[in-house]
Amino acid sequence: MEIILEKVEISQKDILFRLLQYSLFEESLNDQNEMNNEAIFEYEWFENYFIDTDREAYFIREKRTNKLLGFAMINTYVQRVNSGHSIAEFMVIPKYRRNQVGKNAAIQCFEKHKGNWEIYPSYDSEQAYQFWENVVREYTDGNYHLDQAVFVFCKE
């Protein structure tokens, strides 16, 4: 399945928010995410993706049909290198996992923003860790290092 990344426009903010809610719900099995009294998982930086030039959000879509398959949220807030990018949030709808959608979307993110990257897999999620380890290893031909469970690499 061929996929594309589509930059999320402010007019599509509600769609991204709904997808993010699903992702945060899914992650809550492994981290400290809690719903508030309105049944919303709060995400303090969400609005910043539409006003801050250091943050970008993309929908992952099937190229042929334009079907929505997931999303990626990227920022430039890195801790182990002087400058670069990081995947803040990343989710592929479960039905489309295990058929290269996530891998291809991640690689497209890396290709859009050449240079230094830090990838922080979800806490306590072996599945997320394995996914990112496989993607980073393949993309970098093994040329990355692991710093306290954070994948760090540079690809120009």
Spans of model-derived segments:
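Active-site beta-strand termini and strand-to-loop segments that position acidic
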Residues: 61-63, 153-156
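Conserved GNAT-fold acetyl-CoA-binding loop/helix
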Residues: 24-46
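Conserved beta-strand in the GNAT
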Residues: 59, 66-76, 86
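Conserved acetyl-CoA-binding loop-helix of GNAT-fold acetyltransferases
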Residues: 92, 98-111
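A short helix-loop-beta-strand connector motif used in the catalytic cores of GNAT acetyltransferases and
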Residues: 45-59
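A short beta-loop-alpha structural element at the N-terminal edge
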Residues: 3-18, 27
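Conserved acetyl-CoA binding element of GNAT-fold acetyltransferases
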Residues: 83-94
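Conserved beta-strand-loop-alpha-helix junction that forms the acyl-donor binding cleft
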Residues: 118-133, 137, 145-150, 154
